[in-house]
Swiss-Prot record:
Gene this chain is encoded by: ihfA
Subunit structure comment from the entry: Heterodimer of an alpha and a beta chain.
Protein's organism: Histophilus somni (strain 2336) (Haemophilus somnus)
Family, per entry: Belongs to the bacterial histone-like protein family.
A GO CC annotation given for this chain: cytosol
HAMAP family associated with the record: IHF_alpha (MF_00380)
Biological process per Gene Ontology, one example term: regulation of DNA-templated transcription
Function field: This protein is one of the two subunits of integration host factor, a specific DNA-binding protein that functions in genetic recombination as well as in transcriptional and translational control.
CDD domains: IHF_A (cd13835)
GO molecular function, one term: DNA binding
SUPFAM superfamilies: IHF-like DNA-binding proteins
Entry protein name: Integration host factor subunit alpha
Length: 97
């Protein structure tokens, strides 16, 4: 099961925020990350991880259905690199079957 924005909002409500405040906090948090990335800035969240922009160069690709060679154009992607604290906490968890 994945954590959703609604679940984040509900968690803030349980901690004492009203519904409108919780929604504003969650939406504002993600909007600030989006705006920073759109402006070409990396996002560093101490104790959690970093969202970084990477430029991928163009490369040859292949259509998996036809086998035809097609060029894959250059693009900019967002990558997430977990911080050491997050990595060590995740490593301690047991996999769910």
């Amino acid at each position: 099961m994945a954590l959703t924005k609604i679940e984040l909002k509900n968690s803030l409500i349980e901690q004492g925020l009203n519904k409108l405040e919780a929604k504003k906090v969650v939406e504002g948090f993600f909007e600030q990350i989006r705006v920073s990335l759109e402006n070409g800035e990396d996002v560093k969240l101490s104790g959690f991880g970093n969202f970084e922009l990477r430029d991928k160069s163009s490369r040859p690709g292949r259509n998996p259905k036809t086998g035809e060679a097609i060029p894959v154009s250059a693009r900019r992607v967002v990558v997430f690199r977990p911080g050491q604290k997050l990595r060590s906490r995740v490593e301690k968890t047991k996999p769910k079957n």
